[in-house]
Swiss-Prot record:
Main location: cytoplasm
Pfam families per the UniProt record, alphabetical: UvrA_DNA-bind, UvrA_inter
The organism's taxonomic lineage, starting at the top: Bacteria, Thermotogati, Deinococcota, Deinococci, Thermales
Species this protein is from: Thermus thermophilus (strain ATCC 27634 / DSM 579 / HB8)
Gene name tied to this protein: uvrA
Annotated protein name in UniProt: UvrABC system protein A
Record's keyword terms, sorted: ATP-binding, Cytoplasm, DNA damage, DNA excision, DNA repair, DNA-binding, Excision nuclease, Metal-binding, Nucleotide-binding, Repeat, SOS response, Zinc, Zinc-finger
GO cellular component labels: cytoplasm; excinuclease repair complex
Amino acid sequence: MDRIVIRGAREHNLKNISLELPRGKFIVITGVSGSGKSTLAFDTIYAEGQRRYVESLSSYARQFLGVMDKPEVESIEGLSPAISIDQKTTSHNPRSTVGTVTEIHDYLRLLFARVGQAFCPECGRPIEKQSASEITDRLLKRPPGTRAILMAPLVRGRKGEYRKLFQQLLKEGYARVRVDGVIYLLEEAQGLSLEKYEKHDIDLVIDRVVLKEEERPRIAEAVELALLRGEGLLRVLYPDTGEEELFSEKFACPEHGSVLEELEPRIFSFNSPYGACPACSGLGYRQEFDPELVVNPELSLAEGAILPWSRGRDTGRSYLWDRLRALAEHLGFDLKTPFKDLPEEAKRAVLYGLPEPFEVVFRRGGKETFRVEVRYEGVIPWLEKRYQESDSEGVREALEGFMSLRPCPACGGTRYKREVLSVKVAGRNIAEVSALPVREALAFFQGLEKTLPPFQAQIARPILREIVERLGFLVDVGLDYLTLDRAANTLSGGEAQRIRLATQVGSGLTGVLYVLDEPSIGLHPRDNQRLIRTLKRLRDLGNTLIVVEHDEETMRAADWIVDMGPGAGIHGGEVVAQGTLEDILKSPQSLTGAYLRGEKRIPVPKERRKGNGKWLVLKGARAHNLKNVTLRIPLGRFVAITGPSGSGKSTLVHDVLYAALAQRLMRAKTTPGPYEALEGVEHLDKVIEIDQSPIGRTPRSNPATYTGVFDEIRDLFAKTPEARKRGYGPGRFSFNVKGGRCEACGGDGTVKIEMLFLPDLYVPCEVCKGKRYNKETLEVKLRGKSIADVLDMTVEEALDFFQNVPSIARKLQLMVDVGLGYMKLGQPSPTLSGGEAQRIKLATELGRKATGRTLYILDEPTTGLHFDDVAKLLSVLHRLVDAGNTVVVIEHNLDVVKTADWVIDLGPEGGDRGGEIVAEGTPEEVALTGSPTGAFLARIPEIAARIGVAAD
């Protein structure tokens, strides 16, 4: 069968649609936000493919896998097992790294176990284990006739007189011994008076031989005996040259005895007790109390500078407080001096305590009453003890607020045991290789085979082939700047998705249905072609790709396009057009076609705003890969921050700028990345970050509760004559508290029924029929509608219904303006897409009283948005700027960048080759620089015309 045939799909807002998709092709599903793209791709096609695969397993296996619900669809034919690669499933496990997720780390472990060379961590000499016969062979490789003395080391660097040892050796029939480098007959050695408290070395002479092939049996016997007496060690002295050699039959340094386990793959895993650093259990960092969070340096100790203790000080009787007072008296500092002005010695003593006890004199009425010896342990040791000993979750959680993550001092953040780090391949240990950017790691492994001896090269060849292939796939999806030891939970959604894409290409499966969610997110236009090549490669292996995407380049590269619409929510859910790119371009109904033909487009503003003349300047930002960057943001303008993936945009804007502003303006507990100075903060009142995180994680939260419009609607219901007669207040109309809600389902509207081998069933509550309220509450009507009817309205219907209530109508109008008119007021938050959640937040912000002194920060706000949605979003953002605010967006979408007043382009590449500002100015000025983004801006006709005119 060469087609996937879908009949009667009715999931969410799909309107009983039927369509056929070609198998083994690259298919793009597009359409406006909320039109049902993800519902068709993920909730219908993927869910059914996954469900059928899981259904084929035993009931025992199914209970561990969590069975998918059967989607609302009559039939789907021609389905293959489905794999979904979406944005949401980034690992939150701190042990996951880029290397473990892509499985490159497993091959690295194998490589180091098979061809790694161990070195002593103490002295750096190579450690090899050799059998007695291998040692004999090595000795016989010396020039024939070389004299050698074979000895067994008995005592190495230990104190003692050793008279009994010499007597015992004499009894056993040995003749000579070497003591501290001098050879004696054992009779003489007995007469030696060794210093009892000095360290000595004693070697037993086993045999004196001449190295030649005829003597092999005698030499072999001496080697075996020496290894037996020396517990696996043999020392050989060549008397003619004075040279010495030490051999070991164990994996140990013969000099320092540093013992290594057998080189097995498991010791190169930081997730196994055999390889993980014992101090941090292989995490690479430890949670420690941070003096900067524990102390407020502006306050004095008397005013409560020590934040965790500030509660106990009021009583004056607090045990801790008495100790602190005693310390102040002992060291002679004043408790009323601000902490920052105390001498360094006093600060250190307050925080870390004093090693010795000190005497305190207690006085009453000016007279000495008694003396007592006191120990002061210090704030941080006291907090650590409290944290370790407390059984209360609450106490531990409160104390964690004063802790921050620090690289583990034992392993330096590498996650491994010291012995593991002493195993090297081509001069690098596993942590050093993992710390290389993918691009450099690829070059290292491509050249590695040539540097290995032939025998090792043969072992390494198949392992290297796998490593090089997988690194190549990471480069192909534009992730050449990542390092293999980068924690997976620090990756953006787009990066995590592309890593999983690279892993899938690496797995080489065929005949699979892949469903992807906007893989182009976070990709600079110049990396797009590499991604498209990877997608086509996955298709050419014999797979079907269904990609939910808005990117024009990806659409033009697809074999088949499905355009959903015509509107969003209840106005969508239909297939407007489908076919090849030519079919879509010819379709008069297709909104996507109109944009692709160039009929509809997002215009470039005629004038760029000049702003209010004030600047926000962040100097010397150095977090992650930033190279001492100075960021200048013109206030009162629409600013776009651009640059290739991994060039440091999010680090600069989120980790440094936002964190620093939130700390200064909002007293937030954020810890900004390192920077030197922040100027111009006085021109701002607040900073607000509007991201795509959900507006609520429970079905009890919805657009009406988030925007605050629900409170006003409840007030209106409470003012109706019927509600007054019954004495109902606004609380009666809440489904979260007892009183008005249906108690059978607790106001959820659904009841969960647990099924053992099937997914939990959520069925509408029998009592309230899914309306969430009890019968009495629903009897109160406002113009013929109950509170449940209002929650079931779309925003557009509600706007019509409440048009005479200005405060409600204004909030609803803003939701229509940001393109959410189709959404139901009571739609549960978890069912909203990221783009929808972000636009609800925007509408809420627009509804606040404007001071015109707010800085808004948005990270890739066009995620999940169609050309038409981008136009709506831009009009909202420009409204915020017109009110005098400043909007900073991190964005790759050129439709957004071209409408900005000011562009700041980071680069020139990603990772260690990024972290600098390569161009800044108006889009026209940046287009002239030829920077990574400038080159693409110069291709936009309106901008090209302007710079062409300017250039003339």
